[in-house]
Amino acid sequence: MNNSYYVGLMSGTSMDGVDAVLVNFDGDQPSLIATHTEALPKALLSNLQKLCLPGNDEINRLGHLDRAMGKLFAKATNALLEKAGVDKSQVIAIGSHGQTVRHMPNLEMGFTLQIADPNTIAAETGIDVIADFRRKDIALGGQGAPLVPAFHQHVFANPNHQRIILNIGGIANVTYLPGNTQDVTGFDTGPGNGLSDAWIQHQLGQPFDKDGAWAASGTTDQKMLQHLLSHPYFALAAPKSTGRELFNQAWAEQQLSEFGHLSEADIQSTLLDLTCYSIANDALTLSDNGEMYVCGGGAYNCELMHRLRKLLPDYKVVTTSELGMDPQWVEGIAFAWLAMRHHNGLPGNLPAVTGASREAILGSFHPAD
């Protein structure tokens, strides 16, 4: 009986569902066995979005949502194993990222907070859970993010190719994998899908801009784009990370107040270009040319991919499918990998990426028994 399975659970800043993956790490490369996405109920999504911003009665709401998300993550796991026909006894551990509700690493006492109670997940699945991956890195002086570059290095690095792995969720991050060297770098570039998702949700009641069609129907306002790109975050040197605390709907609306003459579609186009230009500007500081492999929800946005290719004519811009990994599941597999690293007593962070003082075993262990 194969007993080498790990489950990875991920809900990103876009909050578009809980991604669950079943992975085997016996070979040189991870083998994806099964996948499942558990939708977030509307009421739960609304409460999570509110919790991501300062408000009243936060501790009570936090405690309730921590348990509720734990139950949802457990439900996703059980559905995944049923779909795969795999018994829980065959799973070594679950690697749960949780749901980020605060990420503020640059305070004097920096912190990050993810919810989805791992004790609840362990109790309702009967499987050991490894969670809370980010806070050890912060305790060591790091940003606690991005964590996926260590995984990207493990599975995508090639000594003969200069590669950027671009993950576009609510926030976008890059991993730079230079050929013939171990000098991997990575950081959050800024907004990914988050701002354009929020705008279309607010204006049209749609969860996201499918294929970037609404953005494509508008015209980018260059004055507004330059205003958005003047945000101090874009000028920061790595290591750096960001989140909804900085780039959120309230921030966008504050910026838009100076540009009331624009159509809704023009604003959507401009928000998409903010994502594309901030990514392209950072890519060009890393290298004039190379290969860019895109994963996350943004990989399915045709207009976004088209604009990136125009901004980076000397880059080959494709999705991670060309490297044999479905763009939707890369992050989930990464957290299954981090669970495997923890289980085997191996470090999971890259200090050159996060700014931590040293490598460390990431995550806390929550036994099923």
From Swiss-Prot:
Belongs to the anhydro-N-acetylmuramic acid kinase family. GO terms for molecular function: ATP binding; kinase activity; phosphotransferase activity, alcohol group as acceptor. The keyword Nucleotide-binding applies. GO terms for biological process: 1,6-anhydro-N-acetyl-beta-muramic acid catabolic process; amino sugar metabolic process; peptidoglycan turnover. Its EC number is 2.7.1.170. Keywords: ATP-binding, Carbohydrate metabolism, Kinase, Nucleotide-binding, Transferase. This is Anhydro-N-acetylmuramic acid kinase. It is an enzyme of class 2 (transferase). Transmembrane segments: none annotated. ATP binds at G12, T13, S14, M15, D16, G17, V18, D19. It comes from the Bacteria. Pfam families: AnmK. It comes from Shewanella halifaxensis (strain HAW-EB4). Pathway: Amino-sugar metabolism; 1,6-anhydro-N-acetylmuramate degradation; Cell wall biogenesis; peptidoglycan recycling. It catalyses: 1,6-anhydro-N-acetyl-beta-muramate + ATP + H2O = N-acetyl-D-muramate 6-phosphate + ADP + H(+). The keyword Transmembrane helix does not apply. Catalyzes the specific phosphorylation of 1,6-anhydro-N-acetylmuramic acid (anhMurNAc) with the simultaneous cleavage of the 1,6-anhydro ring, generating MurNAc-6-P. Is required for the utilization of anhMurNAc either imported from the medium or derived from its own cell wall murein, and thus plays a role in cell wall recycling. PANTHER family: ANHYDRO-N-ACETYLMURAMIC ACID KINASE (PTHR30605:SF0).
